[in-house]
């Protein structure tokens, strides 16, 4: 399945079931609905010690990173992480407005608050799935994690929806490699894939496929990360779980953050269309063979933060 802001591409074989669920999913997304898990409990007016300092640090890291990308591209900071509508690496439609929303410096601050609310503390291991669709939010997750002293292990994909990290030379893994080389942020990515259909960009034409896979291989080398080039969907899932297992080195996963709509994260089952944005509940919602990382992490009892329909979440978190 491939999903971007405002557009959901339903995987082959589930179109009939998805027809009913799609409407409900879009209504929930438009409303910005979110389910807070039981472990968060009620929010209070108290501020954890150091939260605002960490939020300031996260915003500073984010702004510094955006500035580096802006200078490299020769554009303003407001346009630094917004790519072209169509390139050989674009797999799905997206909305330019949603990409602009994702460029707010309030995202790293909001994520520090959310991570504190979920009980995350220095040294905790957080797994993540980053597509190329929302590089601004990928950076926000990285900045918040670094400011809080979290150990972040991400699997990053090359392909993007339109207006995301869609330009060759400035795909998401290339951006991260540039920022890590500049010393702006600690490396987060532990594995890189081409993304798209089959996790091998099979929904692109021949030129797009070869470019995506070349970028994935090159960035994996630059970042000292695994290259994921799976034979099938199940192998794409296993490769990610193996990468997370290696990164956590026996420590428990404190949370899983999904940004964007990669097939491996969302899966091929229509059950994902019922999932709301934000922190997910603890009850498993999909047991099908086609379930993705989001469903499997919930199943394993790992707190999951799902960031896909960004405008609704931005309203709920006070970003808009």
Segments from the language model and where they lie:
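A substrate-binding/cap region within the structured catalytic cores of diverse enzymes
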Residues: 169-252, 256
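N-terminal, Lys/Arg-enriched amphipathic/low-complexity engagement segments
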Residues: 50-106
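C-terminal functional extensions of proteins
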Residues: 253-255, 262-320
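Membrane-embedded segments
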Residues: 106, 113-118, 122-171
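N-terminal Lys/Arg-rich, disordered targeting/topogenic segments
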Residues: 1-12
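Hydrophobic membrane-insertion alpha-helices, especially the h-region
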Residues: 17-36
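Solvent-exposed loop/turn segments at secondary-structure junctions
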Residues: 132-136, 159-163, 196-199, 262-265, ...
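Ser/Thr/Pro/Gly-rich low-complexity linker/stalk segments immediately outside membranes or between
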Residues: 37-53
């Amino acid at each position: 399945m491939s999903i971007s802001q405002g557009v959901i591409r339903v995987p082959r074989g589930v179109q009939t079931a998805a027809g009913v669920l799609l409407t409900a999913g879009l209504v929930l997304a438009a409303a910005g609905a979110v389910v807070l898990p039981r472990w968060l409990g009620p929010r209070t007016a108290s501020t954890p010690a150091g939260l605002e300092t960490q939020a300031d640090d996260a915003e500073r890291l984010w702004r510094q990173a955006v500035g580096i990308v802006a200078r490299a591209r020769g554009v303003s900071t407001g346009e630094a992480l917004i790519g072209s509508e169509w390139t050989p690496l674009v797999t799905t439609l997206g909305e330019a407005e949603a990409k602009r929303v994702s460029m707010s410096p309030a995202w790293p601050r909001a994520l520090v608050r959310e991570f504190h609310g979920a009980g995350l503390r220095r040294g905790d291991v957080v797994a993540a799935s980053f597509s190329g669709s929302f590089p601004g939010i990928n950076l926000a997750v990285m900045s918040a994690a670094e400011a809080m002293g979290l150990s972040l292990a991400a699997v990053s994909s090359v392909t993007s929806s339109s207006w995301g990290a869609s330009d060759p030379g400035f795909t998401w893994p290339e951006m991260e490699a540039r920022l890590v080389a500049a010393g702006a942020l600690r490396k987060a990515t532990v594995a890189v894939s081409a993304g798209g259909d089959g996790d091998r960009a099979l929904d692109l034409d021949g030129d797009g496929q070869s470019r995506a896979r070349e970028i994935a291989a090159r960035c994996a080398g630059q970042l000292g990360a695994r290259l994921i080039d799976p034979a099938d969907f199940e192998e794409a899932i296993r490769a990610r779980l193996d990468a997370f297992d290696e990164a956590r080195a026996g420590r428990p996963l404190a949370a899983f953050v999904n940004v964007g709509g990669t097939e491996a994260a969302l899966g091929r089952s229509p059950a994902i269309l019922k999932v709301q944005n934000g922190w997910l509940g603890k009850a498993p919602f999909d047991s099908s063979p086609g379930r993705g990382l989001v469903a499997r992490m919930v199943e394993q009892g790992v707190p999951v933060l799902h960031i896909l329909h960004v405008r609704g979440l931005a309203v709920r978190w006070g970003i808009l």
